[in-house]
Amino acid sequence: AYWKSFFVPGYAHVANRMKKHCKVITLIHNAIPHEPRFFDKPLASLLFKQCHGFIVMSDNVRYDLRKLYPGAKYIQNPHPLYNHFGSKINKNEACRKLGIHPSKKNLLFFGLIRDYKGLDLLIEAMGQLNEDYHLIIAGECYGSFEKYQTLIDASPAKKRIFVHCEYISDEEIPIYFSAADALVLPYRSATQSGVVSVAYNYDLPMLSTPVGDFKNSIEKPGTGIVVPEISATALAQGIEELFTPSQQATIPANISKEKAALSWETLTRKLLDFINSGFI
């Protein structure tokens, strides 16, 4: 699996040695990193030329791959469901463990905290929402959390924002996703997101900005809302809409339908057909 150029020297060496004996297929999460540097594209091209084929999981990554390596042979398949973290637990119990109130509308920001993920926008949006809305921030910070803490301290919603700025173990994941009522992805840029696949496993509605593959993975199947622009106001308005009766009435069934489509078996069949097709 490839997502950053740091891996290229090792991956390219292995691929170059292995391609004489077997087909080399690379799963690409990001062909170009979210925070690119001048050497990312040439290094990615170096690796891709050593491979027979590729798996991509979004239109954005497919586009980047074809720009970097026009002759690439690939299949495209959505990110399958992450269902290995354990089952959903009782919401009251999950909230008790996190010290939050189960009767509130609990929003979850989950995963590694990086600038491009727009947590600052979500913190600002919380100040525009009423006291029914609480925010859980769960994940390690890539760098200092100080700038986010400053925003939280200055926010009228500071008592409704609960910070768990730390590594979240696999065993803890069911607690956070079971306590939440919605996952929020306020990203400034994206391709696809593994967190979306986790949210599906826990039947969690989602709200995102209009970046990456979120229109295909959230808006198109009707499992949440993609707001029209990247701003705190758009996030706040979208969050309020997500909790309207009309949205709450339709989203659960749409999530169930999408979960059935996001199987690892589907990806396996596509991959085997790709290998056996003679195209690579």
Q: Where are the regions a protein language model picked out?
A:
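Nucleotide-activated donor-binding/catalytic signature segment of Leloir-type glycosyltransferases, i.e.
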Residues: 148-174
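Donor nucleotide-sugar binding/catalytic pocket of nucleotide-sugar-dependent glycosyltransferases
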Residues: 49-88
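Conserved donor-binding/catalytic core segment of Leloir-type glycosyltransferases
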Residues: 101-117, 123-127, 136
